[in-house]
Amino acid sequence: MNVETIETPSLGDRSYLVHDGEVALVVDPQRDLDRVLSAADDAMVAITHVAETHLHNDYVSGGLALSRRTGATYLHAAAEVLPFDHRGVGDGDVIEVGSLTVRVVATPGHTQHHLSYHLTENGDGKGAGAGALFTGGSLLYGSVGRTDLVAADLTDTLTRLQYRSVRGMIDSLPGDTRFYPTHGFGSFCSSSQGGDDSDGTLAGERSVNLALTIEDEDNFVERLVSGLSDHPAYYAQMSPMNRAGGIPVDLSPAAPVDPTELLRRIHRGEWVVDLRNRRAYATDHVVGTIGIELDDPFATYLGWLIPWGTAVTLVDDTAEELVEAQRQLARIGIDRPAGGADGGPDVWGKDHDRASYPAIT
């Protein structure tokens, strides 16, 4: 069994391509499918199955689009009522993916119908074949997924389910099973940031994971819920979009915006976002633009701040960074920027009022 990790550091998430050298299962894919398809091409495998651990709250899934593009079977929790073609699965179900056996494990907590997937070679589940467990937003490295994203009145119930789910996996599967979470790498879907002490096995979590080191369920609930931080406002849009199935993403370049039109948009109070680093923005920027540096948290913070559905125009020094920003925004459902301009403020900011901020070095 081969596990290829597809990182999305901008959201703190991972997707996985799991294969036997011929056919593959993809777990929790993001919308920009070119990365997944490239990984499959590099491994020279055919994608026959796509599996969702849950309806995601931090990104728009690419699962349905990937299944339609490849003809793969799309696995989703049978308990979810969904309007698109998929295969509903539940606890104990078994799916064969080439020489790999996939066993479905119900792990409610992060969401009501959350699933994990335990993969073994030839179905033996013994020794070196203890397999790989894909845990989504359930068991994370040194932590667990947060439990307050579905509804406030369900938080207590989901937290208790999370505690029981994690302990159930640990008790029922071999200790040397390696596990692969989707969240927990900076994602706000994690209840806390952990993982430094995790060795990536179920046995290794016994001494480092809050759900396993706290023996009293009530104490765990109090500790986890009291430690939950705010989460991005755009999260409220993700589950409904995923429940509808999402739409294929269009990553073609945004329409160019000339300096005159850019000024009109600024004067109308539209969101014109300068992607340059904060020092460059502080040194020289066009009055009325909003500086949000293009780094890993870019999409998360823009999605947190902008009123949902508001048009956004992107400006930067290079066309390449406009393309990257567009890709990051598409992952959270902001599909098509209203336009873009590159070349720096001396080009797109020509004849506009400019400003600077004092900076300390």
Named regions from a protein language model:
Residues 1-46, 117-120, 125-136, 142:
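Conserved beta-strand hairpin/beta-sheet module of binuclear metal-dependent hydrolase folds
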Residues 18, 28, 54, 66, ...:
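Divalent metal-coordination and catalytic microenvironments
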Residues 24, 101, 111-229:
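Metallo-beta-lactamase
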Residues 26-28, 46-56, 75-79, 106-109, ...:
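Active-site neighborhood of phospho(di)ester-bond hydrolases with catalytic His/Asp-centered motifs
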Residues 29-30, 55, 79, 111, ...:
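Active-site metal-binding loops of divalent metal-dependent hydrolases
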Residues 32, 63, 68, 72-74, ...:
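Hydrophobic, small-residue-rich alpha-helical packing segments that form membrane-like cores
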Residues 33-75:
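Active-site metal-binding motif and surrounding structural segment of the metallo-beta-lactamase
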Residues 146-148, 203-237, 246, 252, ...:
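Rhodanese-like catalytic fold shared by cysteine-dependent sulfurtransferases
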